[in-house]
Amino acid sequence: MRYLCRPLNAGLVDVLAPYRIPFVGLKPGRHVYRMEVDPLFFASFPQSEIHSARGVAEIVLEKIGSTLDAVVVLDAVVTLPCDRCLADAELPIHFEDRVIAHTGAAVTDLDGEVLQLGPEVYELDLAQPIFEAAHFALPTRRVHAAEEDCDPDVAGYLA
């Protein structure tokens, strides 16, 4: 049989799959995960201000009954436009966040603090919390560490 178009996502790799933790069948207790944060990760979010990044998100997941308590620690070096010259600047970031989820109920977001995961959900998707952590960690002033690292052509206009 011949198809006129390919099925959705045919041949595409799910770049965000490594950021999902299956919790069904996971034993109670503490579990540690290490997730690489790379340029492909941020390319998956079209609204991202970050051009590129290299780093690690360490997740400490505590499963207690039907509760999942995840602490996300992100350490990375991100590339984004310098506020002074618009050339790419590399900036180190660090951020810690906590994600709490309860399983077994309808999917809702309670006060933005606790996620309720329905019975059909079998994995905790941490891609969005990691993405948000990276953006929360960005400094308000995004410039090269040394002014002489700025693009000299643009710096000439500012002088």
Can you describe what each PLM-predicted range is?
Residues 2-159:
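Acidic and generally charged, gly/proline-rich low-complexity regions
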